[in-house]
Amino acid sequence: MAKGKRTFQPNNRRRARTHGFRLRMRTRAGRAIIAGRRRKGRRELTA
């Protein structure tokens, strides 16, 4: 029985572009996420 390939192939640029700060700030929902994390006092807001 063959196993599937490992699906997590780390890539910092892709990580930032998909989950980064600038992407979050683009939409109203994204800004809400940032605001919630600021309210909670998260040390890191985004990837």
UniProtKB/Swiss-Prot annotation:
Leader sequence segment: none
PROSITE patterns linked to this entry: RIBOSOMAL_L34
GO cellular component: ribonucleoprotein complex; ribosome
GO-annotated biological processes: translation
Molecular function per GO: structural constituent of ribosome
InterPro entries per record: Ribosomal_bL34, Ribosomal_bL34_CS
UniProt keywords, alphabetically: Ribonucleoprotein, Ribosomal protein
Family: Belongs to the bacterial ribosomal protein bL34 family.
Protein name as catalogued: Large ribosomal subunit protein bL34
Organism the protein comes from: Mycobacteroides abscessus (strain ATCC 19977 / DSM 44196 / CCUG 20993 / CIP 104536 / JCM 13569 / NCTC 13031 / TMC 1543 / L948)
